[in-house]
């Protein structure tokens, strides 16, 4: 038995200079796992609660000492002596101790850090890589694939201080034969984009996730510049590389309308879906995330109706990695893909349940980072372990983003042909 003998919580820093929670789970025999919780900037209103101290005299109220105290007290007391390999049992104990719908007593950040640290400790106890242990927990032992990366190379919205309303413009190297090749293609496009921006006298500073954040006149301008960068890097848009957008539309949804203040345009729900569809007709955009507000279910139904057969429509704020909300979407034919962020729901077990539900319904799965990250690379193992097919973990700079890519390189090296890179087949509507 992988008996838990100690649990330690601490406050550490994330990639935006804000505190976050880290946990260690120690087992008999000297085995240990350590994990940190990430934090989002554009968050869905129904996400599990990230517990912050609210003490304005310390980190502007963003301290996490209460969450750390919960780890070192209530959570430690509840899990001492338990078996770290019994992930579902551990997570359920923490959920029961919390006793709230959205984990606002203990904090999803506290529960998640311990949940992931326990999984890492259990993998160490079993003497297997983390991805192998997660695949066991998922009921898919030995079934792996390498994810197609969604690389956020140009930022707007909440992730940058510029005139672009759409939050993320991403490239997906679908023509690559391996993850290693996909990463190289993305890096070359990233550097090509930097030179294109410089040549136009535009800013080459980067946003929270490592993408460039130039002040462009419109969202279409962003797509046009990326097209130039892709071609300058020697690749062909539509075959070697497809594009993906994260609109984060909830951030510019006001009074039932979509206000693109950067462009001086206001759209109705259906009007904004028509606008996005027109972009997909001008550029090879294969995926659109959060193309409407999280509460605009009628709008989502229309968007799915007009684009769902050809474009991957990803629900992030829409579904918040929550099986109850995802089930409603599946039952009503809303979207066709889910973004998975384990801090939205707050435990590994619940995350795996959302992935399984999505896949069983024929939805694609995109494993995602948050804008506030750490060096913790657990999402890389999660993507491979569940054969998710796609991963979204930022640009090709900032070590908090690159840590995940580097872990994927290591995993691909270990697994070889046991973890194929399936390219375009992974993206809904594109196979």
UniProtKB/Swiss-Prot annotation:
It is an enzyme of class 4 (lyase). (2R)-2-phosphoglycerate binds at residues 167, 341, 370-371, 392. Its EC number is 4.2.1.11. The keyword Secreted applies. This is Enolase. It comes from Shewanella pealeana (strain ATCC 700345 / ANG-SQ1). One of its GO terms (biological process) is glycolytic process. One of its GO terms (molecular function) is phosphopyruvate hydratase activity.
């Amino acid at each position: 038995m992988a008996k838990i003998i100690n649990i330690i919580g601490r406050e550490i820093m994330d990639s935006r200079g804000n505190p976050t929670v880290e946990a260690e789970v120690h087992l008999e025999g000297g085995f240990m796992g350590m994990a940190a919780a990430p934090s989002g900037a554009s968050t869905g209103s129904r996400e599990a609660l990230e517990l912050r101290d609210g003490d304005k005299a310390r980190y502007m109220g963003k301290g996490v000492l209460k969450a750390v105290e919960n780890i070192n007290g209530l959570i430690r007391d509840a899990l001492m002596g338990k078996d770290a390999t019994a992930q579902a049992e551990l997570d359920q104990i923490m959920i029961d101790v919390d006793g709230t719908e959205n984990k606002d007593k203990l904090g999803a950040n506290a529960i998640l850090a311990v949940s992931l640290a326990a999984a890492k400790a259990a993998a160490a106890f079993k003497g297997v890589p983390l991805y192998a242990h997660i695949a066991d927990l998922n009921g898919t032992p030995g079934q792996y694939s390498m994810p197609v990366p969604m690389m956020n190379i140009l930022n707007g919205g909440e992730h940058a201080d510029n005139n672009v309303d759409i939050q993320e413009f991403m490239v997906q190297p679908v023509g690559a034969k391996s993850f290693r090749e996909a990463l190289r293609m993305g890096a070359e496009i990233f550097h090509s984009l930097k030179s294109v921006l410089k040549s136009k006298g535009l800013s080459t500073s980067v946003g929270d996730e490592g993408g460039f954040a130039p002040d462009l006149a419109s969202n279409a301008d962003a797509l046009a510049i990326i097209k130039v960068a892709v071609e300058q890097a020697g690749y062909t848009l539509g075959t070697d590389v497809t594009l993906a957008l994260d609109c984060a539309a909830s951030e510019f949804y006001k009074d039932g309308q979509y206000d693109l203040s950067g462009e001086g345009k206001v759209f109705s729900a259906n009007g904004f879906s028509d606008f996005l569809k027109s972009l997909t007709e001008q550029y090879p955009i294969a995926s659109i995330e959060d193309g409407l507000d999280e509460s605009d279910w009628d709008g989502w139904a229309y968007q799915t109706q007009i684009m769902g057969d050809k474009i991957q429509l990803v629900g992030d704020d829409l579904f918040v990695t929550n099986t109850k909300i995802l089930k409603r979407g599946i039952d009503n034919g809303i979207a066709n893909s889910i973004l998975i962020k384990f801090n939205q729901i707050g435990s590994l077990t619940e995350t795996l349940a959302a992935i399984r539900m999505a896949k069983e319904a024929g939805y694609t799965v995109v494993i995602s980072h948050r804008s506030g990250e750490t060096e913790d690379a657990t999402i890389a193992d999660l993507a491979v372990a569940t054969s998710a097919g796609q991963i979204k973990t930022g640009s090709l700079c900032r070590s908090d983003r690159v840590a995940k890519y580097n872990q994927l390189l290591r995993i691909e090296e270990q697994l070889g042909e046991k973890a194929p890179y399936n390219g375009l087949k992974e993206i809904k509507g594109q196979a």
